[in-house]
Amino acid sequence: MSLLNVNTIEPSTGTGVTLGASGDTITIPSGATIANSGTATGFGGITAASQWRMTTTFEGDAAPIASNWEVSDSTAYASLGSAMTESSGIFTFPSTGFWFVRFTGMIKTDNGADRAAYNIYATTNNSSYVQVTESQVFGANTGGSNTYASVSSEAIVDVTDTANVKVQFHVMQENNSNDTMGSSSYPQTGVTFIRLGDT
């Protein structure tokens, strides 16, 4: 093995320097430190994150929640990387990878002790959706007054093909007069998407 001692590597022409060839492994020894003052790309990691919310309150079941979604614009909020897209309640991922998905639902019961299920459904063929989580919330009876409660449901989705792997979000109410809460000011019922890394 040859040893090359240098303090600075600069390109002889242009602005790029290539280390090795495709398929090679570049090894950084244990205890070594990479000091980066610029922008590092191609290392995977968290490259995309966004939050969506449902803007309008509705009664009863929804399979899926097909309308009134928007990207959050609350104070200090910002999306990272490429954006998710939504059409009729179907969410499309902007890139392949392992994605963390959290669905939070808020219930308002009218006058009693009722439960609701807020579940994530996924497809791998852009057609048949399968339930992948089950989370239930219970609005306790408080003497006939309205009760509010929230629950979250989480999944890690392996998006191998953005054209076919998609998600949607369902709610099933025990009492169809109960509400799923929505707001255009902050997420009451909403979804968080975080890309964890490469598939």
Label each residue range with its predicted role.
Residues 6, 11, 19, 28, ...:
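Extracellular beta-strand solenoids
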Residues 170-176:
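Short beta-strand-plus-loop segments that form exposed binding edges in beta-rich domains
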Residues 142-166:
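Short, surface-exposed tryptophan/glycine-enriched loops
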Residues 117-121, 168:
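Beta-strand signatures of extracellular beta-sandwich domains
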Residues 34-114, 124, 135-136, 177-199:
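Terminal (often C-terminal
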Residues 131-143:
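Solvent-exposed serine/threonine-rich low-complexity stretches and specific carbohydrate-binding patches
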Residues 1-16, 197-199:
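Short, intrinsically disordered N-terminal pre-domain segments
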